[in-house]
Amino acid sequence: MQILNLTLYPLSYLCHSFQMAGVYIHIPFCHKACTYCDFHFSTSLKNKTAFVEALLREMELRKNFVDEPVTTIYFGGGTPSVLQADEINRITEKLTETFKVMPQEVTLEANPEDLTEDYVHSLRSTMVNRLSIGIQSFRNERLQWMNRNHTAEQSLQAVQCANDAGFDVSIDLIFALPAMTMQEWQQQLMQADVLRVPHISAYSLTLESKTAYAFQVKKKQVQELNELDAEMQFLAAHDFFTEKGYVHYEISNYSLPGKQAKHNSSYWNRTPYLGLGPSAHSFAKNMRCWNVANNNSYIQYISDGVLPLSCEELQLKDELNETMMTALRTAEGLNIETLENIMTPEMYRHFMKEIALQEKRGWIERKNAVIFIPIKHWYKADRIISEFFITT
């Protein structure tokens, strides 16, 4: 793979008309740092106005990147609910002015404490039609450990406000927390079911370096939950939610029928998308690009008319490995016929040999031309998928 730093290259270097499916907008601000989070953000809002101006300017600089209708928009972060409705409108109006926007889904990630009745009402004047609410836990002591800014009661109120205002709602939950018991997790699942939201994301807590959680583990203040217990909690969520009528369509995601996340599904299908804002990633054809992960640098580069991009040109093996990684994390699985015509004979022999081996182990199953990982092994999916990776 080739890494290109485009801060020194002319804008025309990447002005191709890609068939984008969606736009991701990174809002790099948070009220405070969560114990487990290693995403790019700032807890100071002093540059928010300058950031919004830079974001609008970046759209102008990248107007030639998109020639297909933008069908999904996703405000991620960070904490996008730090934006006021008028700021969201400025951003979406500029998107509509710059690109061909035909939105089917416009998602705003939000913290429960931000979703007051007044704020949710103001969002009705925007293009946003879906709220992804970072509940994480319904237990206040867990929220305090996570350094979250909301309470369990605020989570319930936020979902109620969002439902009453007519938004599609998704909630995030975290399992495999330190010392989490199966009983505690089952109580979380039952509370989520009471809300009956259209979409639920359930993530296993992961240990990321340079986080407060990593520091606590290093100092032996807390201990990671063992993998077997974490896997049992994953399977408990699957059994519970599917029994309640949810479709487990991707390892971490459940939806009521027809309510799958359209924007995120484009990632798993490797559909091209455009990322705006500091640290935001874009993908098209055989190229992945990402903006500088520094708010001040991002604002300065954009103000100077320079895109602060670095890019990775994917080789064939990289594209194939990504296809396997994304497809095998979904319930749909991977159609091996789509790879046969683009693999070299040597790659294909390795691939088919690995399929036979993993099928014999019971780690994958095959139905006609489609291979998939059975649910009972989904928690170990990344490990299983890596066995298929082409390294040479």
Residue ranges and their predicted role:
Residues 360-369:
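A short, conserved structural fragment
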Residues 355-359:
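Basic amphipathic alpha-helical segments that dock to polyanions
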Residues 18-22, 41-62, 68-345:
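C-terminal scaffold of the Radical SAM
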Residues 28-39:
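Local cysteine-cluster metal-coordination motifs and their immediate loop/turn environment
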Residues 378-392:
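Short, amphipathic alpha-helical interaction segments positioned at domain boundaries
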Residues 370-374:
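Minor-groove-contacting beta-hairpin "wing" of winged helix-turn-helix DNA-binding domains
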